[in-house]
């Protein structure tokens, strides 16, 4: 689907691993696998709902993005969201939720199935049965006419186009909201099903007078704009996640071999901010009291 640029939505409900791991138990261990676990460079959108209400609307957003950008969109949920219950306001139906009508008009002469825009990387999608739209769908490297091609220059053009679609999407996103003040002593960063626990703990700490805020990331690839500025507004930044990270207090661990949690590693690499992490992989949802402590 990545090479052929076919719209596809994949739902990944994470559970305890690796291998058979802990069936039915919660974990957030798939983030890096979803982003980078493929042969070759395969750009895809990764978004993580933080609440059950988010799960509902994320599927609508994911479908729209997949069709607008002809991309794979992964909705990265987890077992705690998949098995929990939560009341939320009844959704008000909108025609924007619907897929646009299928364009069955003849393809104009000279238009190519992979006529990548030089800036955005986007190209028109040809649908089956569209007059003048016959082309080849293949997982092989191909040229703008969908013909298999191993030409070095054409291959780089295709790779660039698929990557630029992520950059194009990123320019349409808004910065993540900050729960609390935008500057202070400590910022707690989370993603996925940890949202409720983090915000409840932060609210309790703020009620006691602590300068603590939090932000929760929905888009993990591409990341939303403005994150770097948010991180730099705090003296300390820490992620709270349900995946493994080494304990810096372990006698074997130092900065040359410490494994950081998935999101902490991504934030450190992209924004060059000293992001620390706290993690728990007990197979159960992280509790507000644990974050508070």
PLM regions: where:
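Thiamine diphosphate
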Residues: 1-36, 45-66, 207
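Flexible, low-complexity linker and terminal segments
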Residues: 58, 63-293
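Glycine- and acidic
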Residues: 41-48, 183-186
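A broadly conserved detector of short glycine/acidic/proline-rich loop/turn motifs that flank catalytic sites
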Residues: 12-15, 38, 50-51, 79-80, ...
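Short, conserved catalytic or adaptor-binding loops enriched in Gly and charged residues
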Residues: 33-40, 267-271
């Amino acid at each position: 689907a990545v090479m052929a640029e076919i719209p596809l939505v994949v739902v990944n409900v994470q559970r305890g691993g690796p291998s058979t791991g802990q069936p039915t138990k919660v974990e957030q261990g798939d983030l890096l696998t979803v982003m980078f676990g493929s042969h070759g460079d395969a750009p895809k959108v990764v978004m993580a709902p933080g609440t059950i209400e988010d799960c509902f609307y994320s599927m609508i957003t994911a479908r729209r993005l997949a069709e607008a950008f002809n991309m794979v969109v992964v909705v990265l949920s987890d077992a705690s969201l998949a098995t929990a219950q939560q009341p939320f306001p009844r959704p008000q139906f909108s025609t924007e939720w619907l897929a646009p009508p299928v364009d069955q008009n003849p393809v104009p002469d000279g238009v190519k199935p992979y006529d990548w825009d030089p800036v955005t990387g986007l190209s028109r999608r040809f649908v089956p049965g569209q007059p003048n739209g016959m082309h080849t769908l293949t997982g092989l490297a191909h040229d703008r006419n969908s013909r298999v091609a191993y030409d070095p220059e054409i291959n780089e053009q295709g790779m660039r186009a698929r990557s630029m679609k992520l950059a194009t999407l990123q320019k349409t996103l808004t910065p993540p909201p900050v729960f609390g003040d935008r500057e202070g002593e400590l910022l707690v960063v989370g993603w996925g099903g940890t949202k409720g626990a983090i915000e409840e703990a932060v609210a309790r700490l703020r009620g006691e007078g602590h300068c603590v805020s939090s932000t929760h990331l929905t888009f993990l690839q591409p990341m939303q704009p403005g994150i770097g500025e948010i991180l730099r507004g705090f003296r300390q930044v820490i992620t709270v996640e349900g995946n493994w990270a080494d304990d810096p207090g372990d006698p074997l661990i130092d900065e040359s071999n410490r494994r950081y949690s998935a999101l902490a590693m991504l934030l450190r690499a992209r924004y060059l901010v000293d992001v620390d992490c706290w993690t728990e992989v007990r197979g159960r949802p992280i509790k507000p009291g644990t974050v508070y402590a």
